[in-house]
Amino acid sequence: FYLGIRYGEKDRLLDSLYFKNLIPKRNNVSINSNMLKIFDSPNCNTVEKITSTLLGEPEKSTLTLNDFSHIKDKQEKVLKILKSAVKTNAKGVNILLHGHVGTGKSEFSRLIANVSNIPLYAVKTEDSYGEEAKRTERLADLYAKQQILSRIGNACILFDEAEDVLNRGFGSDGTASKGYLNKIIETTPVPVIWTTNNIYDVDPAFLRRMTYCIEFEKLSEDSRLNIWNRVLKKNELTVSKEKVEELNKN
């Protein structure tokens, strides 16, 4: 497996993860690339650190539910869906957040997971060179996280900026099939929160498989102003009323 190389102590730790069913026993490009990070890091020497390297750190939010009071009824619905899915180990639970850029979709995902006390792990958006990850790389990372987290439990996944995956033209270039993604969505062993800026370009076949969808409309000027004031207060920053209003318009 992992390039056919044996690395003593770290190899035994990886075997421990296999034994505990925390890593699927199959060849996966995303997992193999992360394993190279494990072997290159002298501090990656415990099961916990290896697992952290494979998954990344859980996403954290800096906002509160009050910052999304304009969708309070939908907050409660999503919280119930997420908590129930994790508690019952339900499969195929997918939540789609769509709307304009800058309306808080990603931050809302983090907040809902944090409030539910459910660790949220994001599918990578960059490759190992810091460049934009290809669609196939992101899907491989999604699959790897699904397999690992299904064994750990009490977790969910964020697939941010999913336009390149959920669009109507998915599979037309031969890199993957629509049926393959349908299966990933239908059978996901842990809840996945998807975000997109343009729902009109999402393939209807994928939309039908979403458990719940929320539209994020542009915030009113008053709502934005309230958020600015809360953020400034939380960070103990003093800004003039005129400057806050100027920031609010940008």
For each predicted feature, which ranges?
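Interdomain "pre-motor" coupling segment immediately N-terminal to P-loop NTPase/helicase cores
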Residues: Y2-S61
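Compositionally biased amphipathic helical and low-complexity segments enriched in hydrophobic
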Residues: G4, Y18, T64-N66, L97, ...
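Dynamic helix-loop-helix/coil hinge segments at AAA+ ATPase domain boundaries and subdomain interfaces
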Residues: P58-K77
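Walker A/P-loop NTP-binding motif of AAA+ ATPase domains
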Residues: K72-E245
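Accessible peptide chain termini
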Residues: F1-Y2, D141
